[in-house]
């Protein structure tokens, strides 16, 4: 998950002027919860899957983002390992309206369509908790 850079990070580059005031510990917590889900359920995520977070992505924050979609990471791509190729994914935050739209037709093609719309404005799919624009 790529997030808006935080203000105290001297090595970060701003995307569209968005800057977070604090380190994105909420993103680490979200990824830990998703890892627990995968471990317990034995279900993994692939490109163009989505999942609700059942709460705002960051608790006690004014954000419309309540779920994540998974997309191929166009920057990192994939890596070849002795056990085969691994395609790297990234998560991007989605709003309730976008989540509801995906649930109407929960196919990878529909998620890909949403991701394509998002990439037009945000090619790196940076998750900005302050995002108010909805793509559907």
Model feature map: region roles:
Residues 1-136:
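Acidic, proline/glycine-rich low-complexity IDRs
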């Amino acid at each position: 998950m790529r997030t808006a850079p935080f203000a105290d990070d001297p090595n970060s580059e701003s995307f569209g002027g968005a800057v977070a005031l604090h380190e994105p510990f909420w993103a680490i917590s979200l990824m830990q919860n998703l890892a627990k889900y995968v471990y317990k359920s034995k279900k993994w995520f692939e490109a163009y899957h989505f999942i609700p977070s059942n709460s705002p992505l960051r608790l006690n924050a004014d954000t419309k983002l309540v779920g994540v979609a998974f997309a191929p990471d166009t920057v990192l791509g994939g890596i070849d390992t002795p056990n085969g190729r691994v395609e790297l994914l990234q998560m991007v935050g989605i709003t309730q309206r976008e989540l509801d739209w995906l649930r109407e037709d929960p196919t990878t093609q529909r998620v890909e369509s949403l991701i394509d719309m998002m990439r037009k404005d945000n090619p790196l799919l940076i998750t900005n908790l302050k995002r108010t624009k909805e793509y559907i």
